Amino acid sequence: MALNGFGRRVSASVLLIALSLLSGALILPPAAAQRDENYPPPGILKMAKPFHDACVEKTGVTEAAIKEFSDGEIHEDEKLKCYMNCFFHEIEVVDDNGDVHLEKLFATVPLSMRDKLMEMSKGCVHPEGDTLCHKAWWFHQCWKKADPKHYFLP
């Protein structure tokens, strides 16, 4: 049976859609970050503010860079990476090798968030990077990729 022009276009379109789905070429947008008056939890943001302020001052990172990483896209910024490292050191959850002690980190968050953080951390155990700042960034980008909806950077 010969297909007319319209039939060929429809068949070709269906074939392209099927191939896209099968090959993974159809990219779905990442989950949008959850942001409202209750998330990120105001109590955590209040607790984190002194550490945040100290690390902004020490590293010179911009609030815009922090917000973009937290709410937008993963990006590389040396000052941001060092802010992340500073924050880990300020809350005393990282050792001198740049390894985050997850049990200490879990203890710093309320029970209501602990399960999310534990789930987010499953594949984020062995940091890569040549410096402490790069290792800190590795953890954060790993967590953000694992759960972009709930990840936030205070």
From Swiss-Prot:
Classification via InterPro entries: PBP/GOBP, PBP_GOBP_sf
Family per record: Belongs to the PBP/GOBP family.
GO molecular function: odorant binding; pheromone binding
Segment forming the signal sequence: 1-33
Predominant localisation class: secreted
Database matches in SMART domains: PhBP (SM00708)
Compartment(s) where it occurs, according to its Swiss-Prot or TrEMBL record: Secreted
The entry's keywords: Disulfide bond, Secreted, Signal
GO CC annotations on file: extracellular region; extracellular space
Tissue: In the ventrolateral region of the antenna, expressed in two distinct types of olfactory hairs: in most sensilla trichodea and in a subset of the small sensilla basiconica (at protein level).
Cell membrane as UniProt keyword: no
Keyword Nucleotidyltransferase attributed: no
SUPFAM superfamilies assigned: Insect pheromone/odorant-binding proteins
Coiled coil regions, renumbered to chain: none
Disulfide bonds: C55-C86, C82-C133, C124-C142
Gene3D superfamilies with a match to the protein in the record: Pheromone/general odorant binding protein domain
Protein name as catalogued: General odorant-binding protein 83a
UniProt organism field: Drosophila melanogaster (Fruit fly)
Single GO BP term: sensory perception of smell
